[in-house]
Swiss-Prot record:
This is Large ribosomal subunit protein bL9. InterPro entries: Ribosomal_bL9 (IPR000244), Ribosomal_bL9/RNase_H1_N (IPR009027), Ribosomal_bL9_bac/chp (IPR020594), Ribosomal_bL9_C (IPR020069), Ribosomal_bL9_C_sf (IPR036791), Ribosomal_bL9_N (IPR020070), Ribosomal_bL9_N_sf (IPR036935). The gene is rplI. The keyword Oxidoreductase does not apply. Pfam families: Ribosomal_L9_C, Ribosomal_L9_N. SUPFAM superfamilies: L9 N-domain-like, Ribosomal protein L9 C-domain. Keywords: Ribonucleoprotein, Ribosomal protein, RNA-binding, rRNA-binding. Belongs to the bacterial ribosomal protein bL9 family. Binds to the 23S rRNA. The keyword Kinase does not apply. GO terms for biological process: translation.
Length: 151
């Protein structure tokens, strides 16, 4: 019997796949547990429509991510911080601080998990920071760490 998997099933397949399984396994286990549906023409049509909708959503998210990255790359983000005498920061500049600076400058909220810091920033200077957005969109933005009061 052909079934459409509604969830990932070990040793059978992943969600959305059409698989051929024994009638008993389908009727007594997969279908009653809500793991699969019989692959009727109506179910297949619904599955196809759902896949198309998911693809459209992915395209939309990718386009929005590309536009956001272009917007982010247009600006230089100056972040004022308190420092000691030698230009070292009290504490460290984190991805949350950078996300806040981006939000203030562009008006676009960006999640701190999208900002990748290899190591915390502990000194004044100009840095290129990697930004990883949804759908694999990555790029670099410029962040300048300046002493508070000397903008």
């Amino acid at each position: 019997m052909k079934v459409v998997l509604l969830k990932d099933v070990a040793k059978i397949g992943k969600k959305g796949e059409v698989k051929n399984v024994s009638d008993g396994y389908a009727r007594n286990f997969l279908i009653p547990k809500g793991l699969a549906l019989e692959a009727t023409p109506a179910v297949m049509k619904q599955l196809k429509a759902q896949k198309m909708k998911e693809e459209e959503e992915k395209k939309k998210i990718k386009q929005e991510s590309e536009e956001l990255l272009k917007l982010l790359q247009k600006h230089l983000y100056k972040i004022p911080v308190k420092t000691g005498g030698s230009g070292k920061l009290f504490g460290a500049l984190t991805n949350a601080d950078i996300a806040k600076a981006i939000s203030e400058k562009t008006g676009k909220d960006i999640d701190k998990k999208h900002i990748v810091l290899n190591k915390p920033i502990k000194e004044l200077g100009l840095y290129e920071i990697t930004v990883k957005l949804p759908e694999g969109i990555t790029g670099k933005i410029k962040v300048e760490v300046v002493q508070e009061g000397k903008n």
